Amino acid sequence: MIDYTSFLEQEKEGPLARWVEILPDQISEGLSTKRYGDLEQWLTAMQNLPQVDNVQVSYQSAVTLKSTAPLAQETHTLIEQQFRALIPWRKGPYNIFDIEIDTEWHSDWKWDRVLPHLAPLKHRKILDVGCGNGYHCWRMYGEGASQVIGIDPSPRFVVQFYMLKHFIGSNAPVDLLPVPMEAVPANLQAFDTTFSMGVLYHRRSPMDHLRELKATLRPGGQLVLETLVIEGKLGEVLVPEGRYAMMNNVWFLPSVPTLISWLTKCGFKNARCVDVNQTSTDEQRSTEWMTFQSLSDFLDPNDPTLTAEGHPAPLRAVILAEAPE
């Protein structure tokens, strides 16, 4: 089992104290082998990982782990087998002792689009909502964040994260909690920066999600919001009646002006769009480490500007805004 004891002990006196009181039960529910039938075998894969001394870590495009001494072939093979047991790997890339994990998403490309626009992350306490396996959490730490907490309710992603942290070391102030956004106490106001990337369109009530995000931020803290949008004017929103790009849990795709107005309505200040990008089949695709269908399968085979259902193909915007002082 993943041990959160030191994290809970460290946070019980700080701004997360209210959350720490209820977190043990939330963690137990999020990592329940009764709820998630495959979780036990994923945890076994993590427990099978060997110890590697003197690991060097680079938090660049591919989060890279290297050993100062060559690994024995059987050790290298064992590590690769355990990481493959957690397929599919969606966010990355990673390079684990020369094992290249070519993930479904080139998440480094998104980071390169987002990073230049952010308030500097150095010394910041950061929350990453819906963080997947935590790739961007490591990139945030690499930019000098004092602490990064990711939350994601998928236990596979949580185990993937802690497989990396097994080698990086428990002293790194980066953690991933197996909880959804709803688990975060109201009006926590504990974080300098909160990221929500690839989450808003999965929410039945986008306004509620935006208000929840604002409540995580200290006064003046920065929100980094990345979500699917459509081209259009103020007030225009796509609400797919069926699936969108083969996903049945997509609810609201606003135009950029509409999204900015939502943020303003929810009390954010200075909401502005800093990037709009058409998702390409080079950025999101099937790989050896994610062998299922991907973006090319979700688009109209005769017109890649449309989804298989005839909606506009995925267009992603990055919006920044601040909580009021």
From Swiss-Prot:
For binding carboxy-S-adenosyl-L-methionine, which residues are annotated in this chain's numbering? K91, W105, K110, G130, D152, P153, S154, M181, E182, M197, Y201, R316
Per the record, the coiled-coil ranges are none
Checking InterPro entries in the record gives: CmoB, Mo5U34_MeTrfas-like, SAM-dependent_MTases_sf
Would you kindly state one Gene Ontology biological process term found in this protein's UniProt entry? tRNA wobble uridine modification
Enzyme class label:
transferase
User: What catalytic reaction does the record list?
Assistant: carboxy-S-adenosyl-L-methionine + 5-hydroxyuridine(34) in tRNA = 5-carboxymethoxyuridine(34) in tRNA + S-adenosyl-L-homocysteine + H(+)
Keyword tags = Transferase, tRNA processing
Alphabetical list of CDD domains matching this protein: AdoMet_MTases
Return the EC number.
2.5.1.-
Q: Which GO terms describe its molecular function?
A: methyltransferase activity; transferase activity, transferring alkyl or aryl (other than methyl) groups
List the NCBIfam families hit by this protein, alphabetically.
Answer: PRK15068.1 (NF011650), tRNA 5-methoxyuridine(34)/uridine 5-oxyacetic acid(34) synthase CmoB (TIGR00452)
UniProt lists the family membership as follows:
Belongs to the class I-like SAM-binding methyltransferase superfamily. CmoB family.
Q: How does it assemble?
A: Homotetramer.
What does the UniProt record say this protein does? Catalyzes carboxymethyl transfer from carboxy-S-adenosyl-L-methionine (Cx-SAM) to 5-hydroxyuridine (ho5U) to form 5-carboxymethoxyuridine (cmo5U) at position 34 in tRNAs.
Write down what this protein is called.
tRNA U34 carboxymethyltransferase
Organism of this sequence: Saccharophagus degradans (strain 2-40 / ATCC 43961 / DSM 17024)
